[in-house]
Curated annotation (Swiss-Prot):
Keywords: Cell inner membrane, Cell membrane, Cytochrome c-type biogenesis, Membrane, Transmembrane, Transmembrane helix, Transport
Domain of life: Bacteria
Name this protein carries in UniProt: Heme exporter protein C
Protein source organism: Pseudomonas fluorescens
Membrane topology: Multi-pass membrane protein
GO annotation, biological process: cytochrome complex assembly
Function description: Required for the export of heme to the periplasm for the biogenesis of c-type cytochromes.
Keyword DNA-binding listed: no
Major localization listed first in the record, in broad terms: membrane
Spans through the membrane: 30-50
Stated family: Belongs to the CcmC/CycZ/HelC family.
């Protein structure tokens, strides 16, 4: 499969981003694309950490430190 992509490269687009060469697309296109990719990674990381925190709190729901955390969280809201 690797050689078929190299031999008949009209069927497949080459790499748009490489670390060693200038991007194949104009700056007006790749700068927002890169910004959105970085933004997505940050969003994904934040959601992943929140879900991990929730899972730990669910598993440890009967412990005293979770009850204290919930009380602190509810007290901070209002």
């Amino acid at each position: 499969i690797k050689y078929s992509v190299e031999w008949w490269n009209t069927l497949h687009q080459g790499a748009t981003f490489t670390l060693t060469e200038k991007p194949a697309m104009p700056v007006e296109m790749w700068a927002p694309l890169l910004l959105m990719v970085l933004g997505f990674y940050c969003f994904f990381g934040a959601v992943l950490l929140l879900r991990m925190r929730l899972e730990v709190l669910k598993r440890e729901a009967r412990t005293s430190w979770v009850k204290a955390e919930v009380q602190t969280s509810l007290g901070a809201r209002g």
